Amino acid sequence: MRLSRRPETFLLAFVLLCTLLGLGCPLHCEICTAAGSRCHGQMKTCSSDKDTCVLLVGKATSKGKELVHTYKGCIRSQDCYSGVISTTMGPKDHMVTSSFCCQSDGCNSAFLSVPLTNLTENGLMCPACTASFRDKCMGPMTHCTGKENHCVSLSGHVQAGIFKPRFAMRGCATESMCFTKPGAEVPTGTNVLFLHHIECTHSP
């Protein structure tokens, strides 16, 4: 019997062989980042430690202005959360992201709707601040909104081109933010946060 030379048949056979033999074949994900609710990029091979594709759409609201960004890339499965995360880092600084995690080639080529921002105060409060080039920050109490019921404190560095400045943030967050652990790489839509420290507590 002759083997098919069709590329799609060969690819399927290759994937099946990897699965059956436990070879751990590398994952291929679409890679891109752009302003707006869509981005399109090339398929690239993920590094051996990144076994998941991620699609993330983030919306930041600051001083009445809204910015939407989309991110697609490779990520470690333990760093990826499928769902919505909402944070408030000040009275006029809100961020909400919607993410989709998957583990097959090109699975993050889909489309996600821009998440809705719920700015309705829920009666809870947390200390809030943001700071660059620091590991800690202090700030006044701010009102939590929507389903935000935890106070979060986090620090690390930002992957911003060749620069990796430190940052610190505190504020309100949904419980989904608390699944993130130190050492995680967290895409936000515009860049990637490398977390050194994160602490979540129930809002008083």
Curated annotation (Swiss-Prot):
Residues 27-117 form the UPAR/Ly6 domain. It holds the Pfam family UPAR_LY6. Residues 1-26 form the signal peptide. SUPFAM superfamilies: Snake toxin-like. InterPro entries: CNF-like_PLA2_Inhibitor (IPR050918), LY6_UPA_recep-like (IPR016054), PLipase_A2_inh_N (IPR004126), Snake_toxin-like_sf (IPR045860). The keyword Iron does not apply. The keyword Disulfide bond applies. It is found in: Secreted. GO terms for molecular function: phospholipase inhibitor activity. Keywords: Disulfide bond, Secreted, Signal. One of its GO terms (cellular component) is extracellular region. Disulfide bonds join 29-53, 32-39, 46-74, 80-101, 102-107, 126-151, 144-172. Belongs to the CNF-like-inhibitor family. This is phospholipase A2 inhibitor and Ly6/PLAUR domain-containing protein. It comes from Homo sapiens (Human).
